[in-house]
Amino acid sequence: MNFNWDVFWQYLLQPSGVYLTGLWLTCVISVLAMAMGCALGLAAALLRLSRNPLLQLPVRFYVWLMRGTPLLVQIVFLYTALAAGGIFRFEDVQLFGLVVPGNIQAAIIALGLNEGAYMAEIIRAGIGAVDKGQYEAGRCLGMTFAKLMRRIVLPQAFRVIVPPLGNEFNVMLKNTTLVSVIGVQELLLSTQMVTSATFRVFELYLVVALYFLLLTTLWGLFQRCLEKRFGQSDRPAPPAAGSRMFGRHTFKLLRGR
């Protein structure tokens, strides 16, 4: 089968409503699942800091389970196995006037639970990178643990967390393709539906690959801006022109200091 450039350019530059719906749903699922993952990761990371084993052990088990099993298995298990076992079934719900299908709910929760395990380790590493003297200073000021984290530790840890956080969202965008197995009409399943009607497989899969490349590129640019924004306070001040030319001590002598 020859590659049809007309079909390729048509769906790339003038995407159908099915494509636009899948693209929108991919972005919505990614953002909501990432927000859930960050919230779970923060809670899990703070519990890991506790010296109480009753708080640490459940979190350790959660991180071990989510990171040690395939994401595809987690998605299928959450949506189908729980329903088949009579434990829980995702039903359609109405939220703010919109009907949210059960498979979309399961997709967001499954992706969020998986992401929370990875974010827990990222946030824990970011908190561990903060100098221990900051903790002692906060305790000397009489700060509670919550206030110490909110005012001193987490703002500094966020500078360390931003780069891997951006990478995790990049992965999340591509992981949304896995939820097509439970019937969520994201970008990949939308492409499969159009492919079954047009029989132009290579052209349409190349289009969806370029769409994902566009999404990850735009996010990469935004991530770079975030890293620059939160890394400004860690950068040393640029030296003066005379200091660069003559050296720091020579410049002081020229000014009579």
Name each model-derived stretch.
Residues M1-R257:
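Transmembrane alpha-helices and adjacent helix-loop boundaries
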